[in-house]
Each structure stands twice: as structure tokens, then as C-alpha cells.
Curated annotation (Swiss-Prot):
The family this protein is said to belong to: Belongs to the asfivirus MGF 505 family.
InterPro entries in UniProt: MGF_505 (IPR004858)
Protein name per its UniProtKB record: Protein MGF 505-1R
Pfam families tied to this protein: DUF249
Function: Plays a role in virus cell tropism, and may be required for efficient virus replication in macrophages.
Length: 531
């Protein structure tokens, strides 16, 4: 191309063509479009044809390609026309040579599809990609090509699984108009995909569209049983309540009037700790309903924040604490213990709950875990367990809390000292004898005997026997001390009588002499305890 033509092509498009330029000169300059007239550039996106017709450059490119006018196509591409329109025009005119010329510049023919409305050309373009047929419909859904969908409607009516896949695709793209078209034009009555996608993407508009379809499409066609099936069988309220979507819940309640709806909402709210939902509904609940909601939260092991929210709307009382205790013990749910531990009457509340928990807990490990979590004194749990004869728990806590023999013995003896429950004290002292006595040395055994004498332990005389074998002289002194201790601390004569008979038996065995008894135990000699 000579330089004058290049110069004209560069400068003339934005200027008015000289009047003396005839068609021959314009043809030489490459600015004449056969069957259309002169052509010049007008701005960035348009061309001026025959000095008076203004059309978009891409539209001109499509027409030129359909006519297989290589020169004008080349000119318009130089004027920043979109190559995709050249391919579209070539497809419209079946200009395969032109397609082959430019086809290698197209990376993905799917990118051309948004610019095509004609379903036949849409199909032709897609075939160039050598892609499977279903992909055509996916692309039609993606780009909202209703004419293409209508063109292939017969195919969709005979392939409902494919139709459902298209609905799912449209839902994922939030393409509401396509969803409406698919439901209105195809025999699709299962709208589960719409609701599931709406919930998954938290798309309230799509969720509403599902209900609109049910009542505007299904019900008028006398498919009311499907309406009931969808509302109850899909469990939409369960799903949106589990997600904590309050707007979705309120939308669902417009259509679903089941009597159990409130229970479903509250159960899901406490299970998944959706405090926003609880805050919305609590003002509408009765005191008894809030109580039941709290018990459900304990059962579901809800977070402390959820429990605290519910407790803040209840008046704490001994009666309520006892109910709470039962749920704590039954379901091994201990979060509420930490909350009550911060209340004004925490000692009263904790005693009630811990007693129930220790009594009814299925596994000892839950009690131990609770003790560690809330920094509860192990002796406190041990005394509770001893009162109700859960000695395996006492043993487990002792081993968990104190790692050596001496520490365990020390704390168990202290628990006996501070415990008032008689049977519980005896059980602890029996535990000491059964599990720790055989690790003791001489001095420890004599010390234990005095300890047992103070607390009237059932195993006292077993320890006396071992003391006598270890050291008879020290034993006589121990016996005298213990006799005085028992006599001083006894609240009735039973224990004194037992000791006196025991001393009498020792005389018969020859352990004590008559002189020693007259000297140290004159009251026994004067009575009928001597054989």
C-alpha cells in the first residue's frame, strides 16, 4: 500500500472527505465499502457510512464479515473493532474461509457467546469449540440467552435431570430471571436446588423466589400435596434456623404455620449458639418457655454466652438450681457451673449442682474434668462422693489431684476432719485403711490409730492389733491415750463400752496385766468387762 493511501487512512477518518473525491479515488484509498458507499471513522466506537449513516464499528464489522469483505474487515479491525464480531458475521454468512483466517486468534470460543443472541449462530459458534452439547445450555444460562433456551426447550423437556442442573447453575450465578424462565417454561416441580442454593449463599431474594414458585406455579396447577411436601419434607425451617438466618426464618414463617415451629427455632438457636435469634424471640416467650430453652441449652452443651443470655432473663432460685442440676448431671454439661460460680450466692448454687453432678454423672472422668475446669477444691468433691458412697470416684480424684502417697493421705485425713456426715467419714477412713495403710511404717501406724480414735473409726481395733504386734510397750501407752480420747470425744456410751471390752479381752490374752489395768483403767476393773 503506497504512502498516500496510508496517510489518507490515518488522517481522513476523523475529517470530512473532500467533495472532489469520487468512488474510484476512495476505492484506491481503501475507504469505499462496496454496496454501502464511503466509510470513515467517527470517534472510537462508530463509523460513518456514505457521509450520513452512523453505525457502531462492531456492527459494521459483523456485516462486512458476513459479506466476506476482507478489506473492510481489515480496516475495521484496525479501527479497534472486536474480532469476535468478525467471527459472528462470518458464521452468519457461512464464510468459512474468513473464519479460518482469523480463527487461530481466538483462544476460547466461549468468550464469543455473550455477543450472540441468535440461537442458530450460538450453536454454530459453540460447535467450533467441539464441546459437549450440555455446555451450550450452561452457556445460555450463564449469559441469560433466553432465545437459545427457548430454541432447545424440546430437549430440556425430555431431560429433566439436565433441567435441574441448569436451575442449580442459575442459582449459583444468582441469575433470577433465568431461574424464573426455567420454572415457568419447564415442568420442574422439585425446587430443592433453589432453596439449598439460597441457604448456602445466604440469598434471601432467591429464597423468596422459591416460595413464589410454590404458590404461583405449583398450587394453581392443583399440586397442593407438593406444597405440603416441600414445606414439611425439606425441613427448611430446620436448615435456616441452624444457619442462624433470622430473615430467612421470618420469611419461612409466612408460609409454614406448623405448631412446632417455635420449638424448632429455639432448639436450633441454642444448639448452634445463635444469640441473635434468641434475643429476637425471648421477649415473646413465657417464663416457662425460657426455662425450657435454658434446659435445652444445657442438654446441647451451648456456649457460656448463650447460657448467660438465657439466665439473664430468669430469676435464680433453689428450685431452678435443682432443675439445672439434674440436666447438668444427666448430660454431663458443665458450662453453666462456671457461670453460677460468678453469681452472688455461688456457694449455695454450686453445692446443689455439684452434689447432683457427683451423684448422677455417668462417668467419673466428667466430674474430674469439671473439677479441673472450674478450679474446685478436690476435697469438696471427695466429701460429696463419700456421702453418697461413690468411693471409686473418691479414689480417682485422689489419684488425679495428688500424685504421691503422703499428699493423698494428708488430704484424705483433712477431709475426714472437716466432714460432719458420719457414714461419709467412716467410708473415707475405711478407704484410707484399704488403700494406704499397707504403705505405712511404724510411726505412721501409731499416728493413724490416734486419728482413728478421735473419729471413732470402724477399723480402729484392726490398727490396734498391728500396733500391738509392732511394739507392745508403745501399744499400752497408745491404748491408754486412745481410751482417754474416745472417752473425751464420745457422744454416747457405745464406743466407750466397746473399748472397755477390748481392754478386758487384752487382759484375757495376757497382753495387759491386772496391775496395769488397776493402775491405768480402774473403771474397767470395777465393772463386768473383766473375764
Amino acid at each position: 500500500m503506497f504512502s498516500l493511501q496510508n496517510l489518507c487512512r490515518k488522517t481522513l477518518p476523523d475529517c470530512k472527505l473532500p467533495e472532489f473525491f469520487d468512488e474510484y479515488i476512495l476505492q484506491l484509498l481503501g475507504l469505499y465499502w462496496e454496496n454501502h458507499g464511503t466509510i470513515q471513522r467517527a470517534g472510537n466506537n462508530c463509523v460513518l457510512v456514505q457521509q450520513h449513516t452512523l453505525i457502531p464499528v462492531n456492527e459494521a464489522l459483523r456485516i462486512a464479515a458476513s459479506e466476506e469483505n476482507y478489506e473492510i474487515v481489515s480496516l475495521l479491525l484496525a479501527w479497534e473493532g472486536n474480532l469476535y464480531y468478525a467471527i459472528i458475521g462470518a458464521l452468519e454468512g457461512n464464510r468459512h474461509d474468513l473464519i479460518r483466517k482469523y480463527d487461530d486468534q481466538i483462544k476460547d470460543h466461549h468468550e464469543i457467546l455473550p455477543f450472540i443472541d441468535n440461537p442458530v449462530i450460538f450453536h454454530k459458534c459453540h460447535i467450533m469449540r467441539r464441546c459437549f452439547f450440555d455446555c451450550i445450555l450452561y452457556q445460555a444460562v450463564k449469559y441469560s440467552k433466553f432465545r437459545v433456551l427457548l430454541y432447545f426447550k424440546y430437549r430440556l423437556e425430555n431431560d429433566l435431570p439436565l433441567a435441574h442442573l441448569l436451575v442449580e447453575k442459575a442459582c449459583e450465578d444468582h441469575n433470577y430471571e433465568v431461574i424464573k424462565w426455567l420454572y415457568e417454561n419447564l415442568h420442574i416441580y422439585n425446587i430443592m436446588e433453589t432453596f439449598e442454593c439460597a441457604i448456602a449463599h445466604k440469598d434471601l431474594r432467591l429464597y423468596r423466589l422459591g416460595y413464589t414458585f410454590i404458590y404461583n406455579r405449583i398450587v394453581p396447577y392443583k399440586y397442593h400435596y407438593l406444597d405440603v411436601l416441600i414445606l414439611s419434607g425439606l425441613h427448611l425451617l430446620y436448615k435456616v434456623a441452624a444457619k442462624g438466618y433470622l430473615d430467612f426464618i421470618l420469611e419461612t414463617l409466612k408460609y409454614d404455620h406448623n405448631n412446632d415451629n417455635l420449638d424448632i427455632i429455639l432448639t436450633q438457636a441454642v444448639t448452634y449458639n445463635h444469640r441473635k435469634i434468641l434475643t429476637y424471640y425471648i421477649p415473646q416467650l413465657t417464663y416457662a418457655q425460657i426455662e425450657q430453652c435454658l434446659f435445652m441449652a444445657i442438654k446441647k452443651k451451648s456456649s457460656k454466652k448463650t447460657l448467660n443470655l438465657l439466665l439473664s432473663h430468669l430469676k435464680l432460685s433453689i428450685k431452678l438450681i435443682k432443675k439445672i442440676s439434674q440436666y447438668v448431671a444427666t448430660y454431663n454439661s458443665t458450662n453453666i457451673i462456671g457461670i453460677l460460680n460468678m453469681k452472688r450466692k455461688k456457694k449455695i448454687y454450686l453445692d446443689i449442682i455439684l452434689t447432683k453432678f457427683v451423684k448422677y454423672a455417668i462417668f467419673n472422668k466428667y466430674v474430674v474434668r469439671c473439677m479441673d475446669t472450674f478450679s474446685i477444691n478436690p476435697e469438696r468433691i471427695i466429701k460429696m462422693a463419700a456421702r453418697i458412697n461413690k468411693m471409686l470416684l473418691v479414689k480417682k480424684i485422689s489419684q488425679h489431684a495428688w500424685k504421691n502417697h503422703a499428699a493423698r493421705l494428708k488430704h484424705l485425713k483433712h477431709a475426714v476432719y472437716t466432714m460432719k456426715h458420719k457414714d461419709g467419714k467412716n467410708r473415707l477412713m475405711n478407704l484410707i485403711y484399704d488403700h494406704y495403710y499397707y504403705h505405712m511404717q511404724g510411726e505412721e501406724i501409731f499416728s493413724l490409730a490416734r486419728f482413728y480414735a478421735i473419729h471413732h473409726a470402724p477399723k480402729l481395733f484392726d490398727v490396734f492389733y498391728d500396733c500391738c504386734l509392732l511394739d507392745t510397750i508403745r501399744f499400752k501407752s497408745l491404748l491408754l491415750d486412745c481410751s482417754h480420747i474416745i472417752g473425751k470425744n464420745a457422744h454416747d456410751a457405745t464406743n466407750i463400752t466397746i473399748v472397755n471390752k477390748y481392754i478386758g479381752n487384752l487382759f484375757a490374752m495376757g497382753v495387759l496385766s491386772k496391775k496395769e489395768i488397776l493402775q491405768d483403767y480402774p473403771s474397767i476393773y470395777s465393772k463386768h468387762y473383766m473375764p
